[in-house]
């Protein structure tokens, strides 16, 4: 079999394959023989159908098409093997199948073209001496006070209040019913449109402006128990329920009771109630340590993201469609698993209409992820960065001890750990051989959009899910 190769874009190898006359004839005859054994034709037993009858009943074009399918499949497989091509994914026929049927004659040579994806060639122009900027996340001691105050609020006792009007910080018990406010030009005599789910009885609302839609809380402030009034409010835009987004509303509100919060004292008893610590001092120290580490981890992550973003700029690679589609599949699978774990019906979210849109929107991120991964692999290859079995086993043992009750696939865990350790080593090497300048938090946000990897599509679908469920 004669095979001619050519290099194509998107990391493809083009193949021109010429099949010998002997093979085209032999395959055609074999197809006729096989069909005569399997086709049911009245008046004839299987395997005893005369050749001419078979050709008349099925048609020569049908038989040629069946033979051609075998010739193409076998021809491509043999060509890949003969040329020692490390193909990935499924081969693609470049010639027109219909044209091949018309030109195919058993006993004559058959020439057709196909293409296969191969692993891409990576040209890493630079990977040492990279320069980037990353935001430094500094620990703020005020976070400890904020967390403790939040815990106090959650443990607050509600005390009924008499003799005064509602004020910010109170908890109001109200009945309310909401309608869409009429716009200019609406029929004045028409019944106002009720807001779906916009009514409640004995509803407790904390009088903080961010607890409800804008205008609702401020409308209650100043009311006395027993008062009823109309409160104007405005649904934000965007809003979970897009049909209500940006619309003005009127709520008829009756204030039934006012309560104020009595907060527990910040002392050792409080610490024991909200944590496993015996003293408030120990609780504060633990929180401070946690948020200090969190700030350090975020800073390190920012450094890594900045460095990887810079590395990608120096990678020249023509990605094959097979790898891109595989990465998109992985991203959507991760998203589906995350949504399923949240209790959402993935089958209702991933409809036949939305999947193609999600795939298209996921492509840029898939390409970015692939470039990062291939870039790291190339650095490891050039610098001989590896992980030892001892390092892998140590991390596996650590993880197993952390999750003793989990049913863990040991082989899969080892693979994941090996990949993680290798990535960590490569990134540490890059950090040691590059310069990442730390700049104040927020100073880069407006300059360059942050590249978030797996979560982007998840967040997109989660918004759609919330709209669907009305949550």
UniProtKB/Swiss-Prot annotation:
GO terms for biological process: 'de novo' cotranslational protein folding; cell division; chaperone-mediated protein folding; protein transport; protein unfolding. Its EC number is 5.2.1.8. Keywords: Cell cycle, Cell division, Chaperone, Cytoplasm, Isomerase, Rotamase. Residues 169-264 form the PPIase FKBP-type domain. GO terms for molecular function: peptidyl-prolyl cis-trans isomerase activity; protein folding chaperone; ribosome binding. GO terms for cellular component: cytoplasm. The keyword Cell division applies. It is found in: Cytoplasm. Pfam families: FKBP_C, Trigger_C, Trigger_N. It is an enzyme of class 5 (isomerase). InterPro entries: PPIase_dom_sf (IPR046357), PPIase_FKBP_dom (IPR001179), Trig_fac (IPR005215), Trigger_fac_C (IPR008880), Trigger_fac_C_sf (IPR037041), Trigger_fac_ribosome-bd_bac (IPR008881), Trigger_fac_ribosome-bd_sf (IPR036611), Trigger_fact/SurA_dom_sf (IPR027304). Belongs to the FKBP-type PPIase family. Tig subfamily. Consists of 3 domains; the N-terminus binds the ribosome, the middle domain has PPIase activity, while the C-terminus has intrinsic chaperone activity on its own. This is Trigger factor. The lineage of its organism: Bacteria, Bacillati, Cyanobacteriota, Cyanophyceae, Nostocales. The gene is tig.
């Amino acid at each position: 079999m004669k095979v001619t190769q050519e290099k194509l874009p998107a990391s493809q190898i083009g193949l021109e394959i010429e099949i010998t006359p002997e093979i085209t004839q032999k395959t055609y005859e074999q197809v006729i023989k096989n069909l005569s054994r399997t086709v049911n034709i009245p008046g004839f037993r299987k395997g005893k159908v005369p050749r001419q009858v078979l050709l008349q009943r099925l048609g020569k074009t049908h038989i040629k098409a069946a033979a051609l399918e075998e010739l193409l499949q076998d021809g491509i497989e043999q060509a890949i093997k003969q040329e020692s091509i490390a193909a990935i994914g499924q081969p693609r026929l470049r010639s027109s199948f219909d044209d091949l049927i018309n030109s195919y004659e058993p006993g004559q040579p058959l020439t057709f073209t196909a293409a296969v994806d191969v692993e891409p060639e990576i040209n890493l122009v630079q990977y040492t001496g990279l320069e980037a900027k990353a935001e430094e996340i500094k620990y703020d001691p005020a976070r400890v006070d904020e967390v403790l105050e939040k815990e106090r609020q959650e443990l607050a006792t509600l005390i009924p209040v008499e003799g005064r009007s509602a004020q910010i910080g109170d908890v109001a018990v109200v009945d309310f019913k909401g309608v869409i406010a009429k716009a200019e030009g609406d029929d004045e005599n028409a019944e106002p449109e009720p807001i779906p789910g916009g009514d409640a009885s004995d509803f407790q609302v904390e009088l903080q402006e961010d607890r409800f839609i804008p205008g609702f809380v401020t409308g209650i402030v100043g009311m006395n128990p027993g008062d009823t009034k109309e409160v104007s409010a405005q649904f934000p835009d965007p809003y979970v329920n897009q049909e209500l987004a940006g619309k003005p509303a009127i709520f008829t509100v009756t204030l039934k009771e006012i309560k104020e919060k009595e907060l527990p004292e910040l002392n050792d008893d409080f610490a024991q109630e909200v944590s496993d610590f015996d003293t408030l001092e120990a609780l504060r120290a633990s929180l401070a340590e946690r948020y200090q580490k969190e700030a350090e981890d975020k800073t390190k992550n920012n450094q890594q993201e900045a460095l990887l973003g810079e590395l990608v700029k120096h990678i020249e690679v023509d990605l094959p469609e097979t790898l891109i589609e595989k990465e998109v599949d992985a991203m959507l699978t991760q998203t589906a698993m995350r949504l399923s774990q949240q209790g959402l019906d993935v089958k209702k979210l991933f409809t036949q209409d939305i999947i193609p849109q999600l795939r298209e929107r996921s492509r840029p991120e898939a390409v970015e992820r692939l470039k990062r991964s291939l870039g790291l692999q190339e650095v490891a290859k050039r610098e001989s960065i590896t992980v030892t079995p001892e390092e892998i086993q140590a991390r596996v043992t650590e993880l197993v001890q952390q999750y003793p009750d989990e049913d863990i696939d040991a082989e899969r865990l080892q693979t994941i750990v090996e990949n993680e350790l290798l990535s960590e080593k490569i990134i540490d090497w890059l950090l040691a051989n590059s310069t990442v300048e730390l700049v104040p938090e927020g100073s880069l946000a407006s300059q360059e959009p942050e590249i978030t990897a797996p979560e982007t599509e998840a967040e997109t679908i989660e918004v759609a899910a919330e709209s669907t469920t009305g949550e």
